[in-house]
Amino acid sequence: SCFTIGELGFGLGLNFLTTLHCWLKKERAFNLDYIGIDKKVLQKRNLRLLEERFPKLHKEIEILKECDVVGHNGFECISMPNLKIRLILITEDIQKAVNDICISNIDAWFLDGFDPKKNPEMWTDDILKAVFNLSSSDSSFSTFTSVGRIRRALSENGFEIKKVSGFGSKRHRLIGKKSKEKKKSHDIKRVAVIGTGLSGSNIAYNLANSNIKVDIFDAHDDLSKGSSGGPIASMYPKFSLNNDLRSKFLISSYFFSLNFYKKTLGFKNTGLLFYGSDDAKSKWISKISA
């Protein structure tokens, strides 16, 4: 029910936008997860450069512009539930990024297409082993390069290689797939969710959106009758003076939630005003705004 693409070298997102262009033309019977890895932060203002060069991608670029992309090191998950897409951006050194991914079901790879001499860290044995281990049993890959040592390295790390015609002035490129192994099925068919508050409702929604049958149980006769049933809900990030992991997690969580609720519940981000109700809070507000 979900197809996962991994890309080494996300850049400005041209491959993602092209994938999105194709995705919008098809009937979406399953979900798409797109994992993009790059050591540089995606700057939304740079998308105009792509729009000038690739005007046919205008619609897709506008979709990405509308998302609240934070742009920071680490993981960032951008949900587009109406399109059945999750874009997971990982802004880290390539070795750390692949080490931090904890799934092993990536179905297709866009491998770095630049001259391997310019990006040797993208083609080490450790990286290619990680790509193999993170791949599903039927995983495939493509790359713009066709250098002999890259062909051999991919082959030595478990991939079947094929050299095919390239694009434009490029004579050849490489495609391939993971060498066959016994396929294991871990498909979940049906899930019971107990509770219809914010957590239970969100879990049920995401499971159903993944084409999984859901049974919902609650002691009350309607949704969110417990502590989640308040008439008004506010959402805001918990700011910290330290750029530590907890702070990054809270900021990422806020923007993920903002994207999600805007696209599912018509959430209106009206803003909140904090007053310095005591000396401690006044000092905290002053430091945050400095």
Positions of the model-derived regions?
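Class I S-adenosyl-L-methionine
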Residues: S146-D187
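S-adenosyl-L-methionine
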Residues: L49-I101
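Conserved beta-strand signature within the Rossmann-like core of class I S-adenosyl-L-methionine
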Residues: D138-T145
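Dinucleotide-binding Rossmann-like beta1-alpha1 core, especially the glycine-rich loop
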Residues: I232-A290
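SAM cofactor-binding core of SAM-dependent methyltransferases
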Residues: F3-C67
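N-terminal Rossmann-like FAD-binding beta1-loop-alpha1 element of flavoenzymes
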Residues: I188-D215
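Glycine-rich FAD pyrophosphate-binding loop
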Residues: N209-G229
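A short glycine-rich, Lys/Arg-flanked "PGG" loop and its adjoining helix->strand segment in the class I
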Residues: T124-S137
